[in-house]
Amino acid sequence: SKITGPIEASKRRTVQASVAGIETIKAFSLEPTQRKEWRQISSSSIRRSVAGQIANLAVTNINSTLTQIMTVVLVFTGVLLVLAGSLSAGAIISCNMLAGKLVAPVTAIFTFFADLTNFKNTIDTVGTTWNGPTERLGAGNQHVVKGGVVCRDVIVKFDDTAALNGLNLDIAPRTKVAVVGPSGSGKTTFLRLCQGFLRPNMGAMEIDGQNIRYLSLDNYRSQTTLIDAKPVFFGATIEENLRKVQPNISEREFQEILDISGLSRVLEELPDGISTEINQFGLPLSQGNRVTVALARGLMAKPKILLLDEALVNFDKSTQIGFFENFPKIAEHKTVMMATHDMRLTAEFEQIVVLEKGIVVGQGKHEDLLKTCPLYKELWTMDQKLSGA
């Protein structure tokens, strides 16, 4: 109805955004925000529903009154016609019965459509309820992350396949690390492990000396951000997407993040600027601009660990140059790990980790790995040939 229609549409949008962007919600620990938004919309829906029921009751009463008036008018007119000799008593009784038979089906038709709408809403509600194991969010230690990551014999399996197969790694806090290796070597799995979305099947992963199993997930994720080449957003304006992560950020910090992420330049090219509406996939923005928005959103969270999974693959050359010009500011006070196939980018990092079949086969600086790690040298040589260097 006109009373409940808009609010029900808002409920559906909220549910759809929560389902489609569930990993984004988990990544930024936005569960309380989404829960609050849902409760506010549900409260409005209840109030609107009560108003709708009152309106429906009024319509029902009016319909009943009109039906009774119609019966009285029909009988009164019939009596006059009978007295005038134009109609028999049997005819008036027949007309009254026929009118009753006509009114009932018409009323039933309207009732059917009302019931059909209620049934559809119920099915929608049931259909959008997802069942799955709940995560251990608030339980665990509240820890201020510094950014140290240690993996000891970590194994992560998908079915019977080991994506990480005895990973041993030690990354100091506030280090800039490039993670390289052939496809299927475990780069993305490692980053998602660092994000807190995966758990080791065997072995131990420590954050600043604490086993990640004993940390509060929502507390840890709120200090860790992963950005990949296909980010997911909420159907809203660019500004609303950014502020959802950090509603109380100051205007100075907000503008600074727009500048260092490169989003300021992107916004200048958009007719509606920061008020541009985007859908969950970031359309109508180009793929590179979507990643820029995702980078700005990630920096809004002020993460202590920043994870980039092939995030620069859709950047053009000028955007890549701008990114690395601002990289010192982006990486300030953070541990940064970037998985990449573009070996030319590794020179910007303090350490390089080389993965193959889920294990570390090399770790160090570019010059050292060229001498000590055959796989790294092979990857570097192939990249140089492709680039014509």
Q: What function would you assign to each model-found segment?
A:
Residues A301, E332:
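Conserved signature/switch motifs of ABC ATPase nucleotide-binding domains
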